[in-house]
C-alpha cells in the first residue's frame, strides 16, 4: 500500500486524521492532500535513480497548488511546466529556476521571454516554428537558450488512446526522422544551446517496455547526433508511471529505474 488514506471502523482517515474532523474545521467541499504520501512517492522515484545524475520533475499541470509545489521544492524536486503561470507558481513555491523544464505546445513570446529571464534549465521544443521563436527571443535578450526537442519515438505506450501521445498518428512531438535535421538547424542558429533530447509517450503507463523501446530509439538518435558533434547532456523521459485506479498493476519506480539503467 503506497498511500496514507485508510478506513478505520468504516471512517476514512488521512494520516490517522479523520476526514470528518477536517470537514468540521474547514467545511466542505475541500481537497485533502497527504504530504506523507506525496513525500513517499517522490522519494521512491528519486531514490530509484540515485546511482545516476538525475532530476526528478513534478508535472505542475497535474496539481499547481502552491502548498504542494512547496512540499516538492523542499524535497529537491524539479518542475515540468507548460505555461508562464505555472512558471510563476513554481518560482513562488521556492523551486530554483535551474530545476525547471518548460514543455508543452503553444508557448507565447511573453512566456518564452519570462522563462529566459528566469534562467530555467531548458525548453522542450515541439515544432520548427517554436525553435525559431525561441532563437528570436534569446537573440533579443542577447543570450543562449538551452533547448531540447521533444521527439515522437513512434512507440505504442499501450495506454488509453485519449492519453497516448507517442505514436506516429499522435499530434505531439517531432518525428524521429525530422528531429535530426531540426537539431542540425538548431546548431546553425546563433542563440540556441542544444542540451537535450526529450519525449513524452503518454500517461497512465503500467508497463516498462514502452519506455525501453523509446530509450533504444532515443539512444540511436543521440549517437548519430554525437557523430555530428552535437553533445547532448540531458535525456528527458516522460510521462510518468501509471497509478492503480482499479485493476492496473504499474511497476514500482525501482523496477522502472533498473530497466532503464540497464
Where on the chain are the PLM-derived regions?
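A charged N-terminal "starter" segment
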Residues: 1-145, 189-193, 220, 227-230
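Glycine-rich tight-turn/loop motif centered on a GG-T
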Residues: 24-31, 117-123, 161-174, 207-211, ...
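Structured alpha-helical segments in the cores of large, soluble enzyme domains
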Residues: 41, 152, 176-193, 218-232, ...
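Short beta-strand segments
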Residues: 59, 146-152, 198-200, 236-238
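Conserved radical SAM core fold
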Residues: 65-68, 86-88, 109-111, 153-168, ...
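Conserved anion-binding
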Residues: 118, 127-193
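C-terminal active-site-proximal or functional interface alpha/beta core segments in diverse enzymes
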Residues: 203-262
Amino acid at each position: 500500500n503506497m498511500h496514507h488514506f485508510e478506513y478505520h471502523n468504516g471512517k476514512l482517515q488521512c494520516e490517522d486524521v479523520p476526514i470528518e474532523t477536517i470537514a468540521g474545521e474547514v467545511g466542505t467541499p475541500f481537497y485533502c492532500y497527504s504530504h506523507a504520501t506525496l513525500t513517499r512517492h517522490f522519494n521512491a522515484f528519486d531514490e530509484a535513480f540515485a546511482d545516476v545524475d538525475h532530476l526528478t520533475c513534478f508535472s505542475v499541470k497535474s496539481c499547481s497548488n502552491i502548498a504542494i509545489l512547496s512540499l516538492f521544492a523542499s524535497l529537491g524536486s524539479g518542475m515540468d511546466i507548460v505555461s508562464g503561470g505555472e512558471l510563476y507558481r513554481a518560482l513562488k513555491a521556492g523551486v530554483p529556476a535551474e530545476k525547471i523544464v518548460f514543455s508543452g505546445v503553444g508557448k507565447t513570446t511573453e512566456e518564452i521571454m519570462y522563462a529566459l529571464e528566469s534562467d530555467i534549465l531548458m525548453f522542450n521544443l515541439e515544432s520548427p516554428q517554436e525553435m525559431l521563436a525561441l532563437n528570436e527571443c534569446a537573440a533579443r535578450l542577447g543570450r543562449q537558450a538551452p533547448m531540447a526537442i521533444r521527439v515522437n519515438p513512434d512507440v505504442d505506450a499501450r495506454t488509453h488512446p485519449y492519453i497516448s501521445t507517442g505514436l506516429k498518428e499522435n499530434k505531439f512531438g517531432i518525428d524521429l526522422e525530422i528531429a535530426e535535421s531540426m537539431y542540425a538547424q538548431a546548431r546553425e542558429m546563433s542563440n540556441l544551446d542544444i542540451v537535450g533530447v526529450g519525449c513524452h509517450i503518454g500517461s497512465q503507463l503500467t508497463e516498462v517496455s514502452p519506455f525501453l523501446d523509446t530509450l533504444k530509439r532515443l539512444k540511436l538518435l543521440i549517437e548519430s547526433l554525437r557523430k555530428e558533434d552535437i553533445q547532448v547532456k540531458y535525456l528527458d523521459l516522460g510521462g510518468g508511471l501509471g497509478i492503480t485506479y482499479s485493476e492496473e498493476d504499474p511497476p514500482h519506480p525501482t523496477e522502472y529505474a533498473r530497466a532503464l539503467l540497464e
